[in-house]
Amino acid sequence: MNAWRLDTQEQTVIISSNGGIPFIAYWDVKLTSKEDLAQLLDSFPQDFSGGVMDKAEYINFCPTSGDGFLGQPGIILHDENGIDILPNFKFIDAKKEGGMVFESRDEYNGLSIFHKISIHGEVFKFQTTLQSKKPINVGGLSAP
């Protein structure tokens, strides 16, 4: 599992990805610079399910029906004929650009989604950008 950390003077955000769109694994008081992110991530998520077969999961920045999310999707797309597009994004890259930019792609549907996190004092600003190789209709796109 990949992990990246962003810090302000008072707080730390740890972003992680297990192969799909990244998610917030930790957002709380500032961690020490010596904190072992791998060990911290291994302690999450805790099993609150009472031993059932379903495991606890993080909700990523933009949950989709295409990746098996059963709740309200973070993105609703249709092709030019009104047919649902069920994206299944895979994590591609993370870059430091005025904060962090995370890129995920759905090659099959020709989609790319970028999640940018920038720091302004003690405020984390989240921005989502969707790109498509072909015309699509966006019925909804939620930013984290």
Set out the residue ranges of the language-model regions.
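Acidic (Asp/Glu-rich), glycine- and aromatic
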Residues: 3-7, 16-20, 30, 109-111, ...
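Hydrophobic beta/alpha structural segments that scaffold and line small-molecule/cofactor pockets
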Residues: 13
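Substrate/cofactor-recognition hotspot
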Residues: 23
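Acidic, aromatic-enriched beta-alpha/helix-loop junctions
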Residues: 27-52
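N-terminal trafficking/processing presequences and adjacent post-cleavage segments
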Residues: 45-48, 56-65
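Extended, loop-rich substrate-binding clefts of extracytoplasmic carbohydrate-active enzymes
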Residues: 60-123
